[in-house]
C-alpha cells in the first residue's frame, strides 16, 4: 500500500504536507502509515483514500492499476 499511496500522491500532485493537512494526520503518523501500512487503522486509511479520491480497494492495490478517480 505504501507504494500505491506514493503513486497516487504524485498523480494528484499532493505533497505529504498537503496530505497531512487535508487528512488532519500529523506528519510523523502519516509517514509511519505510508512506511508501515499494516499497523494503520481503518479510519485513517479511509481518510487517506478520501483525500486521494480513490476507493480503499484502489489504495490497497499494490499493482497500481488504473483508478477511477476523475
From Swiss-Prot:
SUPFAM superfamilies: lambda repressor-like DNA-binding domains (SSF47413). It comes from the Bacteria. This is SPbeta prophage-derived uncharacterized HTH-type transcriptional regulator YopO. SMART domains: HTH_XRE. Residues 16-35 bind DNA. It holds the Pfam family HTH_3. Residues 5-59 form the HTH cro/C1-type domain. It comes from Bacillus subtilis (strain 168). InterPro entries: Cro/C1-type_HTH (IPR001387), Lambda_DNA-bd_dom_sf (IPR010982). PROSITE patterns: HTH_CROC1. Keywords: DNA-binding, Transcription, Transcription regulation. GO terms for molecular function: DNA binding.
Amino acid at each position: 500500500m505504501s507504494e500505491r499511496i506514493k503513486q497516487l500522491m504524485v498523480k494528484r500532485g499532493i505533497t505529504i504536507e498537503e496530505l497531512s493537512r487535508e487528512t488532519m494526520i500529523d506528519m510523523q503518523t502519516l509517514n509511519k502509515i505510508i512506511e508501515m501500512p499494516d499497523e494503520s487503522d481503518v479510519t485513517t486509511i479511509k481518510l487517506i483514500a478520501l483525500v486521494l479520491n480513490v476507493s480503499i480497494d484502489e489504495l490497497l492495490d499494490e499493482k497500481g492499476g488504473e483508478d477511477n478517480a476523475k
